[in-house]
Regions:
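Conserved donor NDP-sugar-binding/catalytic core segment of glycosyltransferases
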Residues: 276-326
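Active-site donor/metal-binding and catalytic loop motifs
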Residues: 163-170, 396-412
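Acidic donor-binding segment of Leloir-type glycosyltransferases
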Residues: 198-241
Length: 633
């Protein structure tokens, strides 16, 4: 695999990497989580780490300071030990809470636990005074359906300081080598900051043997002074690679390919470049993966970057017939304030997003590398493929990173091409597509876009269906050509451009009134309303505009009432101007009908083609070709 660009820090010889990525001698006890009491920066509330239940107390990253009569516990998002997940998925039968204390007077330390209903109980407790350490143990034999463990401390007779809190278990025979793979594209500062967060935690770094930074951009992270500082600190642990832009799929796959070519017994931790990283999450994922009897994909949860208290979902699954990822798994919390709520019941994932996700090299050896999908659905497809081969995916609670909220990104975007195309490919590979059900859903969502004057979005989705119908060859170049052409084609549709809100008057030559949405159509009348809106748009029997429509009200069934609407972009960065255009409506409607006829006719045979092509598309040889910049083979 070739590299391009000038030599710079992060160039490491294969022999050094081979020596580093070897199994390590196991300690007597393995640390599976550390006690942290504040977040990685001021934007993150400390209540996600430790809760001051009563009295006065002060929290530091690795220490708690309690005044007399104060009570503090770690019954929090990052403070809880996920007992149910360890009992279900690992060989661990007992966990030990260990901490150091300095008590000026009598104090009490408790090991507390909960069940699947959230009922709390005391597992063990001890009275302390002076200076020393505490060790409290719990058997993991009562947490199958849910429940967690946490520490509680009470400064009874005077001030109390707690430090060096660790959750430990009996170590496995050896510790697997571990590498992080960060994929980046023109987010140089974000990537450098993520790298700095990992490098700044010595405890985490001690358990990582290599960090691969795969740079696919033109604004390279290697040019940043911070990167140079980190590179000097990391030395031979840092591997910096340049390659053509193959999207997140190609960036992450490069890391997986590099590590698995050295050893088939390693943990590869994929990590986005633009997250707010909690380094402790790396330690927790890696420790958990060392304890599973079967190689297991172990993923972190996603917390919201703008609203750091909120969790996207406890665990996710995909609805393939409806082409929908991000469905909440049974019992899963979703869009939840994790200061107020706790995950009581264990919830099992079907897949995990690659914002931070550990993939064992044994899985790669067994099922191959990811598909060259560029972006979107690659993580879903890979876990489905691994699951079919007997390798589960676990989304680990109390291991999370902060990632930009998806609802702040407008649906009408070039990436929607890959969402639709890759969802169809995934469904073809891992389900028996009912062309009637899936075809009806596709027709509906594209018609909704056409009738609500989002012609560029409709074109984007139709193009995705058309390319799916081309068969496996659509994946041959890794997706770069499709990304470029879809962007160029979308530029022909005026409503795909976002304008500053202050220009609304200039755009419309007036000050349009705001028109909020009414009620959602009754499910029983949904298709009737859709047909009616389509007829009215076709005949021009729409309400004259312009009108202003907030993003929260920009539903197809509302926007399609008008012939001219200024709609707030979901990013809140500006507005889109939507205008009825009968010629575009007519052209796109005809393309849609043609594409769906072909979809119903060709999909059964296409499923066989995609399945037959999977081994070659996910092969090391195919990916090396793409890494080397050969789009045609």
């Amino acid at each position: 695999m070739s590299e391009r660009g000038p030599a710079m820090p992060g160039q490491v010889s294969p022999d050094v990497l081979k020596h580093a990525l070897t199994e390590h001698a196991a300690p007597e006890r393995l640390v599976v989580a550390r006690g942290l009491f504040t977040g990685p920066n001021a934007a993150v509330t400390d209540d996600l780490y430790a809760r001051i239940a009563s009295g006065r107390a002060h929290r530091e990253r690795y220490a708690l300071h309690l005044e007399k009569s104060a009570t503090v516990d770690t019954n929090t998002y990052f403070g809880r030990f996920p007992a149910s997940y360890f009992q279900r998925w690992t060989t661990v039968t007992e966990v030990q809470l260990k901490l150091a204390f300095e008590a000026s007077g009598r104090a009490r330390v408790l090991l507390r636990g909960s069940d699947s209903h959230g009922n709390a109980r005391t597992i063990a407790s001890t009275e302390v005074d002076g200076t020393g350490t505490v060790e409290l143990s719990a058997q993991l034999n009562e947490f199958m359906d849910g429940g967690a463990l946490w520490m509680e401390c009470i400064a009874v007779g005077g001030p109390l300081k707690i430090t060096d809190l660790e959750w430990t278990v009996a170590a496995p025979p050896s510790i697997r080598p571990a590498a992080i793979a960060i994929c980046t594209f023109n987010r140089a500062d974000d990537c450098a900051n993520t790298l700095a967060a990992i490098a700044g935690d010595k405890g985490v770094l001690a358990g990582i043997d290599a960090i691969y930074v795969v740079d696919q951009g033109t604004d390279c992270v290697g040019t940043r002074p911070l990167f140079g500082e980190i590179a000097a600190q990391l030395g031979d642990k840092l591997v910096y690679l340049r390659q053509p832009n193959l999207g997140g799929s190609g960036g992450f796959t490069r890391g997986m390919c590099e590590v698995s070519s050295i050893t088939e017994h390693a943990n590869v931790i994929l990590m986005d470049d633009d997250i707010l990283c909690e380094p402790e999450t790396v330690l927790r994922l890696n420790a958990f993966a060392n304890l599973t009897p079967t190689p297991t994909i172990v993923g972190a949860q996603m917390l919201f970057l703008k609203n750091p208290r909120y969790l996207l979902a406890g665990a996710e699954e995909a609805n393939l017939p409806r082409l929908k990822p991000g469905r909440w798994a049974p019992n899963s919390l979703h869009n939840s304030d994790m200061v107020k709520h706790k995950q009581k019941k264990r919830t099992d994932a079907q897949y995990n997003g690659w914002w931070s996700c550990l993939i064992p090299a044994e899985v790669i050896a067994a099922v191959g590398l990811p598909l060259p999908m560029f972006i979107k659905w690659d993580d879903v497809e890979y876990s489905l493929r691994a699951g079919a081969a007997g390798f589960p995916t676990v989304t680990l609670p109390n291991a999370g990173v902060w990632h930009a909220e998806f609802h702040w990104k407008d649906l009408d975007d070039w990436t929607h091409y890959f969402i639709v195309r890759n969802s169809l490919i995934t469904a073809a590979l891992h389900s028996d597509i009912d062309v009637s059900v899936t075809g009806t859903i596709l027709t509906r969502v594209i018609a909704e876009a056409i009738f609500s004057m989002r012609y560029g979005l409709a074109h984007t989705m139709i193009r995705a269906v058309e390319d799916f119908l081309e068969g496996p060859s659509v994946l041959a170049d890794g997706g770069g050509a499709a990304a470029a052409s879809v962007r160029a084609e979308r530029s022909e549709y005026a409503e795909t451009t976002t304008h500053p809100g202050v220009e609304t008057g200039e755009l419309t030559s007036t000050l349009p009134p705001t028109r909020p949405a009414g009620f959602l159509p009754d499910k029983r009348r949904y298709y009737l309303v859709l047909a009616k809106r389509g007829v009215y748009q076709w005949l021009g029997r729409t309400i004259p505009g312009p009108v202003m429509i907030p993003a929260v009200d920009a539903h197809w069934w509302h926007v399609s009432l008008f012939d001219y609407a200024v709609v707030t972009d979901a990013s809140q960065a500006g507005v889109r101007v939507l205008r009825r255009d009968k010629q575009k409506l007519k052209k796109l409607s005809r393309r849609l009908m043609k594409a769906m006829r072909q979809f119903r006719k060709q999909t059964p045979s296409l499923q066989a083609q995609y399945r037959a092509a999977l081994p070659e598309l996910s092969s090391r040889e195919n990916w090396v070709r793409l890494f080397n910049g050969d789009p045609t083979g």
